[in-house]
C-alpha cells in the first residue's frame, strides 16, 4: 500500500509544545528570568551561580547556621564554571596553534540571532559559502570551492563531526546530514588541509560541533523563535549534575515553517541527550543520543523568467512529482577520555547512525521511445528514492606533550551501508521499483601531527595522513511496465534527447584508493595574541559512492574514477590587539592557492542525469578574512559598538581544460561579504544593521548563464 512517508510531526509538535513549556516553567526552587531578544524570547535559568545562589538562600531561610552546606554549594558552582572555561580555552588554544585557516564559532553567542539552519551558523566563517536555497534545512555548503558540481546534493568535500566523532558517511558524502545548529556549544571550522587533526584531507576541510553538557549548561532553558512565513522554532533543555560522578542533559526541539514559496513547508522534531560518567579521577565516559525526524517539501528550481514573473511559485515538476526530502535518523555515540598524566591523554569513541530516506525528486518525463510497441510519447523516467543507510565509526586520539613538542596521533575507521532503490514516482507515492541499489564504503584514516616549539616565537608543525578507502556500488536495473505495457527491449530514446535515464542504467562497480598526504606548517608569534603563519599541504579525496553511481556503465565491474589529488599553499595572520582597557580589534586573514588534479565534477547533459568525471587540472584560490572589534562610546564602557565583517574572494577555474578551457567553476560567487555593526548597552540591550553583499556566479561549466550579484540589508 502506497503512502507518503514519513508522517508529518506537526501533530507531535502541537501536543508537546505546551508540555515543553510546562516542563521548564514548573520547576520549584529555580528562578527563571525573561530576556527580550531579536526575533525570539528566551527564558533561561541563569546558569550555575544563580541556581546555586537560589538554593543557598532557601537553605539560609531554613537554617541560618548551616554554613557547611552553603560553602559546599558555592564550591560546586565554581567547579562548573571552571569546566566551561577550560573547554573553551582548550579549543581557543588549539586554534591559535594551527598554522592555517581555522575559525572557532561560539554558538552560545548566536542565541540572540535568528538561527534556523546551518547557513545561519556559518554566516561569519570566512571561506565558507553557505546558503539555503529555499529557506529550510537543505543547505548548500562550499568550503574553498568544494561541492561545485551538478551532483551537489551529496554535499561532499567537507567532513562533519560531532564531539570528534563522524557525522559524514564513510564514503565522504553528507547527503541528508542535518546537524541542529543550536545543539552545540561551539563549532571549529578547519578549512582545507588545516583539518588534518580530524583525519580530513579534502578541499573543504572539516567542521566539528561540540555538544553542551550539564557541566556547562543552565539547569533549564527555553527558547522560542518566530518569524515570517509561519516560522516557529522551539527548544527546551533540562540538565542536572546528580553527584560527583553522574550528569545528564536532554533537549527537545521542533521547527515548523510554511515557507516563502509554494510547496516549501517543513516540519522537524529533534531529541538530543548526553550522559556523563566520571569513572575515576582520570577517566570520563560520555554517551550521546539523538533522534531527528525532518520532513521537507522541495519547491524545485525556476528559470529566470519564472522567477521574475513570480518568485514565490514552485516549479511545475516539483508540484507534479510532489518533491520531498523526508528523513528519520537515530544516532548513538560514546566517547571515553583517559587523562594518563598531566602531559598525555587518550580518547576513544564510536558512533552508529541509522537513517531512512524517502525522497520523491524527479517527476515523469515524456519523450518518444523508439523501442516502445505503441510509439508516441511515453515515460522516459521518474524517480523516488527509498533507502536505509547505516554508518559505523570509530575514532582514537593520543596526545602527548614532551620537551618542546605537542604530539597528536590518531585513527579513524568508518563503514557505510546504503540499501534501497529508485522507484517510479507517482506524485510523491512509491510506484514500481526501477533499480535495486546497494552501496558500501570503508574508510581508514591514520594521521600524526606535531607542534614543535622551536623557540618562544617559532613553531614548526609537520604532519602526515594516510587514507585507505574502498567503494562499492551494485545497481540492478529491473524491467518495469510503461503505461501498462511491458517493455520489448531496454528503453532507448532518440539521440537528440541525450537521455541517460535512471531506468536503463545498471551495473556494478568497485575500487580501492590509497593516498599519503604530508603537511608542513610554520608559525611566528608577533605578540602573545598575534601571529603569522604559512603551510603547504597535500590534498586527497576518493570519490563518493554517489560519484561512482553516476559513472557506472552497464555491465561494468570497476569505475574509472580516480581520487582527487592536489597541493595547497597558504599564508596568513590572526590575532587580537587591545587598544586600551575598553577598546580592541581582532582579525583573521588567510590567502591560499591550490592546484588540483582529477577533481571530480558531475556534468549534466541536456535532458539527462549527472555524469561524474575527473578533470585533469583545476585551480582553487582565494582570500579569506574576518575582522571585528569592540569600541566604547564612553569612559565606562556602558555604550559600545561591535562591528564584524567576514569577507571572501574566490577564484575557482579550469586550467586549460580541453572542453572548458579556463572557464570559472559554477555555483560559488566571485566574492561575498557579510557584516554587522551592533550597538550594545551594558544592561544587555543591543541593536544594529546587518548586511550581505554577494557577487555574481556562473550557473554552468560552459559559463553561458550568469547569476546576478545581490545585496541585503537587515536590522536586529
Model-derived features: positions:
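Gram-negative outer-membrane beta-barrel transporters
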Residues: 456, 460, 468, 584-597, ...
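Structural signature of Gram-negative outer-membrane beta-barrels, strongest in the C-terminal barrel
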Residues: 280, 401-414, 437-594, 678
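Extracytoplasmic beta-strand/coil segments of soluble accessory domains associated
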Residues: 87, 91-94, 99, 119-165
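N-terminal periplasmic "start-of-domain" segments of outer-membrane beta-barrel proteins
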Residues: 59, 66-67, 76-113, 139-142, ...
